[in-house]
Amino acid sequence: EIYNKDGNKLDLSGKVDGLHYFSNDDSADGDQSYMRLGFRGETQINNELTGYGEWEYQASLNTAESEDANNFTRVGFAGLKFGQWGSLDYGRNYGVMYDLAAWTDVLPEFGGDTYGADNFMFQRANGVLTYRNKDFFGLVDGLDVAVQYQGKNGSATESTMGRDVLRQNGDGYGMSLTYDLGEGFSAAGAMMASTRTSEQNGRQNPAIIGNGDRAETYTGGLKYXANNIYLAAVFTQTYNARIGVSSDSSHLGYADNAQNFEAVAQYQFDFGLRPSIAYVQSHARNVPGYSNQNLTKYVDVGASYFFNKNMLTYVDYKINLMDDTRLTRDAGINTDDIVAVG
């Protein structure tokens, strides 16, 4: 907090991560250092109405000064909070599917691989209008509700001047329910449905696989956080969700359906050590030309050590269980282990 006076508040957040990857995969091996800087502000309009906004930026620390392609805005949105009636904001924000994905995206470095930014409403996304209500209008303690709409983000072509086809979306909506069961237990569910753009169905690039009018996702999860123990598991069923990591891949597109599973267990010792173990898998079915294939599969073993609330060090070992197949080669999916130290 850097300012708090007369109903106006401004918070500053930041992070500097000196991060290095060790891997046999040349595309992953090497320096991955970055920094983040963010602001969050609030202004009290009256007893029931509060305005707020948030912005966060990430800058790479592993590129030459003349290169800035990896610098980007993570989130940026503004909104109004209406007391117990909830809040409404618009901008670049987290999709409602991440209300659950965040439960397992807590590993020292990796995790959250079955989701991804700019992939409909799975994670960070553009043009989202989000309504949130805590404790269901004050009627049900622990029941939080979110409803979201995302406007179309498309491109006339797949040129460098337009949006990458894998990161486009049509109009869509989603919602989530999170319930605090007490004693450290929570349960949640979420869904989203978005139309696919014509480019995502191969209008500009006939090589794109997996045509479909809509992308749909349904997810459920459980979490336990008490007594220094953290346990979480999330299962997701997707339809027409993307595969591949880049339009530069020789094969990219969408799986007819896929099942994603993430589970994590952690323990916080009083002296600052937090060991972590996790399992992550995304299995696609009926991928045109490839049949049933894993898109992600690994075990993660890591640990963080907190010197204090502002400083930590960590190591994270991603034990890749993916086989080297035609799909992994065509779609640019990594099959090598990675050790991250930061």
UniProtKB/Swiss-Prot annotation:
Localization in the cell: Cell outer membrane
Any one GO BP annotation for this protein: monoatomic ion transmembrane transport
Superkingdom of the organism of origin: Bacteria
Keywords from the named record: Cell outer membrane, Ion transport, Membrane, Porin, Transmembrane, Transmembrane beta strand, Transport
A molecular function (GO) term: porin activity
Main subcellular localisation: membrane
Gene3D superfamilies per UniProt: Porin
Cysteine pairings via disulfide bonds: none
Single GO cellular component term: pore complex
Membrane topology classification: Multi-pass membrane protein
CDD domains according to UniProt: gram_neg_porins
NCBIfam families recorded: PRK10554.1
Subunit and partners: Homotrimer.
Family the entry assigns: Belongs to the Gram-negative porin family.
Free-text function comment from the UniProt entry: Forms pores that allow passive diffusion of small molecules across the outer membrane. In R.aquatilis OmpC is involved in the adhesion to wheat roots.
Protein name: Outer membrane porin C
Lineage summary: Bacteria, Pseudomonadati, Pseudomonadota, Gammaproteobacteria, Enterobacterales
Gene label: ompC
